[in-house]
Amino acid sequence: MKNSSIVLASASPRRSELLESAGIQFRVVPADINEEPFPGEEPVDHVQRLAEGKARAAAELAEGRFFLGADTIVLCDGEIMGKPKDAADAKRMLNKLSGVPHEVVTGFAIYDRERKGAVVEAIRTKVFFKKLRDEEILDYIATGCPFDKAGAYAIQGGAAHMVQKIEGSYTNVVGLPLCEVVDALRVIGALGN
């Protein structure tokens, strides 16, 4: 798809792969912002704020017109799960997710430098994990896969066998709700017809 200078404000290879799979041309300019939640901040507000913050931060670093930022969290029993700090944190997260449904929430923002405004959305997907055995958790942690993933797992990788079902967008769980992002890019004029 043709574009008018789209910049992805993320170093995530998964987000890049998803955009590439849709035929979208873009450049990557990672934006580093503080990702700590504000006290009392609601999960949807949190991911939307971070997504827009990343998009606007990338606009300070690079040329272009449209800047796409995104942030994904896992929400389980009211806890916002970002990326685990270490193996013990990954084990704690996976134990908490074991056998219970949880939500993956991805906020995305497309900042339009020309119009000086942003489209900001959040998409929720419900994920159901099977009951995990301790050795499954430890084996998965040993792969190193959990450490750069919200909730300590990647549905598209080594954790696929842990997921019984999902309700909602699969690509949202991967890290970017592609259907909604492509629609938003089209609506704001970043893509051709």
Swiss-Prot record:
It catalyses: dTTP + H2O = dTMP + diphosphate + H(+); UTP + H2O = UMP + diphosphate + H(+). The keyword Nucleotide-binding does not apply. One of its GO terms (cellular component) is cytoplasm. Its EC number is 3.6.1.9. The active site is at D71 (proton acceptor). Its cofactor is a divalent metal cation. GO terms for molecular function: dTTP diphosphatase activity; UTP diphosphatase activity. It comes from the Bacteria. Keywords: Cytoplasm, Hydrolase, Nucleotide metabolism. InterPro entries: ITPase-like_fam, Maf-like. It is found in: Cytoplasm. The keyword Iron does not apply. It is an enzyme of class 3 (hydrolase). Pfam families: Maf. One of its GO terms (biological process) is nucleotide metabolic process. The record marks R14, T72, Q156 as: Important for substrate specificity. Nucleoside triphosphate pyrophosphatase that hydrolyzes dTTP and UTP. May have a dual role in cell division arrest and in preventing the incorporation of modified nucleotides into cellular nucleic acids. Belongs to the Maf family. YhdE subfamily. This is dTTP/UTP pyrophosphatase. It comes from Citrifermentans bemidjiense (strain ATCC BAA-1014 / DSM 16622 / JCM 12645 / Bem).
